[in-house]
């Protein structure tokens, strides 16, 4: 049985920063393996739902090594894609990806974004919110820096609703993924934390309500990956 590695709330931010610093160099490889390569299509769908204008400004929160940043830059050939993260080694690992792109990394915290009000036309975030200490505060910050009419698209973990799929999902992420991490020389604690954090993350309906209470309008979501993930969207109304 896996040992619980989830940190107490007052230690979570420091724990997460240290963990992602440790796994930065192999994160992309392990992430692709862990999601069976489906994460690429999910990111593309998320950016399409955010649909930033071609000459606009888009922000990716918890950008990590910049996979979303690349998608956003390609969507906006005359715009600017900004990725913010508080784990510097992750962004350093992603620098080769954004070479030649209209994209930049910025150090910052999702709960205190280093940007002025109404700075961005679209905001994306992927597999980030389960790592923050206050999901509602993160959505309020997104709302603050979004322009009126701006969009948010959030890709996050979910759990399949069909019982057999849910059981298979549990076995894969709670048992198989940590073993794969060990076999591939990845950090076993990190790849125990990731599925455990997903297990306690709010379900899609609850996350949608958190978004509404943070100020977002027209909130909806779609399930992807047989219900293993969800893409939530919203609009900032005047």
UniProtKB/Swiss-Prot annotation:
Binding site for S-adenosyl-L-methionine: 65, 85, 109-110
Gene3D superfamilies for this protein: Vaccinia Virus protein VP39 (3.40.50.150)
Enzyme Commission number, as recorded: 2.1.1.163
BP terms from Gene Ontology: menaquinone biosynthetic process; methylation
Top class in the EC scheme: transferase
Catalytic activity: a 2-demethylmenaquinol + S-adenosyl-L-methionine = a menaquinol + S-adenosyl-L-homocysteine + H(+)
Alphabetical list of Pfam families matching this protein: Ubie_methyltran
Signal sequence segment: none
Family the entry assigns: Belongs to the class I-like SAM-binding methyltransferase superfamily. MenG/UbiE family.
UniProt-listed NCBIfam families: MenG_MenH_UbiE (TIGR01934)
Role, per record: Methyltransferase required for the conversion of demethylmenaquinol (DMKH2) to menaquinol (MKH2).
Name by which UniProt lists this protein: Demethylmenaquinone methyltransferase
């Amino acid at each position: 049985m896996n040992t619980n590695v989830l940190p107490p709330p007052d230690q979570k931010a420091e724990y997460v920063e240290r963990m992602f610093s440790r796994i930065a160099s192999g994160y992309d490889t392990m992430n692709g393996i862990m999601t069976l390569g489906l994460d690429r299509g999910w990111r593309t769908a998320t950016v399409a739902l955010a649909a930033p204008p071609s000459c606009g400004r888009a922000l990716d929160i918890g950008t990590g090594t910049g996979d979303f940043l690349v998608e956003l830059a390609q969507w906006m050939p005359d715009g600017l894609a900004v990725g913010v993260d508080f784990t510097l080694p992750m962004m350093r690992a992603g620098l080769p990806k954004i070479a030649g792109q209209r994209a930049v990394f910025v150090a910052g915290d999702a709960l205190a974004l280093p940007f002025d009000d109404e700075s961005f036309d679209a905001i994306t975030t992927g597999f980030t919110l389960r790592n923050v200490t206050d999901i509602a505060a993160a959505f309020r910050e997104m709302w603050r820096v979004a322009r009126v009419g701006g969009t948010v698209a959030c890709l996050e973990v979910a759990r399949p609703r069909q019982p057999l799929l849910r059981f298979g999902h549990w076995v894969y992420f709670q048992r198989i993924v940590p073993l794969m991490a060990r076999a591939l020389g990845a950090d076993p604690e990190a790849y125990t934390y990731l599925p455990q954090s997903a297990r306690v993350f709010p379900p899609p309906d609850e996350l949608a309500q958190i978004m509404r209470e943070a100020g977002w309008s027209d909130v909806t979501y779609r399930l992807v990956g047989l219900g293993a993930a969800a893409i939530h969207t919203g609009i900032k109304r005047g």
